[in-house]
């Protein structure tokens, strides 16, 4: 094992006291301290002091006060600041990637590619919307009584203060999705990171201040549990909540936000499916399975967990998959050769182990993996499970780990019906060399995004969000405009 050397910037940052970033300043929390654990070792790497309710309120007031100035800034100037932030994240790419890898267990390669390179790309995309958020002029049909005329137009106006609740699996990239969309529309934002990954957004907020984003436009409030998030959501200054996370927590967020009439965007994951058609070889199927289900230890909201394979090829595919996964031995996320790191926190580690044991108890077949690795850290073997039926827990409950469930089908129509029987619908994929058939199935699958011969690829130009129990609203593309602006109509008589 050969780990990269941590940059001095990273070690110096870790030694600092950590709390909040409010009104352009770092400040210690007034709540309880909590440890930040490196999931590769199980050891604390830093301590963060949580905000108390007064600090949460002050962050919201800071964002509200900054809103009036920020919304009046010329739109191209807002876009220019987002471009500067993108350039700064690119300059600090390695330091931020190392910090994220330490906190989340993400391999350093993925941290560089996804957390940083994708964040930079999304910032630049959203910056390009500056000056392009437009309304319409409208012809109206009101009668003229004395020669008067009428016209009307619409305009998009920023909502106000956005509360962005960010999960632990992609703490920089998902925060940037929310931050960039809010800021380019003229909103300000208060970000609440997960207590498992609270550090990187503090550094991003510092860099945002350094490039000239005014104080109060971006605030970061830390805290364990849901109390601080609830305080932010219910604050009178909150105009919108953007949440990414679990279904159970998302339902609570929706209830709290809706009770006071606030806009809400929810991206909740679920139980995503992948369908492999019979024309593919077992080798092609296995390559697709690894891409769809095991990237980042399966800790991706859109990752596939249910795999539908032709019954006649099921055993051959699973035998080949078992051989391929043997090369994915988990290792240190700071080793550039590592393909699979630890799970991001102890709670998730315990949950995944519990679900694997449930599969055993229910009579499912563990094809490979299924065990924790000895030693320190939250490492699990990549696991493939051949389930008995659709009633297996692993076909219904989100695992969010390196565990994929496989079941055979005898007709493609049967497989489609079983895929759509889920209460969730964030993402799915169809794999086939028959593009005509794959495109037809993409129309029938009940999911917010359907990939063909690919999985878990996101592009800022393509809207992303869930159907059914997997969420409300869309991110990216032009769809984000509806969620961060108010559509105002103006009618004129002249």
Residue ranges and their predicted role:
Residues 1-40, 125:
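Hydrophobic face of amphipathic alpha-helices that form TPR/SEL1-like repeat modules
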Residues 43-46, 238, 275, 356, ...:
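Conserved C-terminal structural/oligomerization subdomain of aldehyde/semialdehyde dehydrogenase
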Residues 44-51, 66-72, 163-164, 274-277, ...:
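Short, well-ordered beta-strand elements within core beta-sheets of diverse protein domains
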Residues 67, 71, 86-93, 97, ...:
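Structural signal for hydrophobic packing residues in well-ordered secondary-structure cores
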Residues 134-284, 409:
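Rossmann-like NAD(P) dinucleotide-binding subdomain of oxidoreductase/dehydrogenase enzymes
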Residues 248-389, 452:
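ALDH superfamily catalytic-core signature
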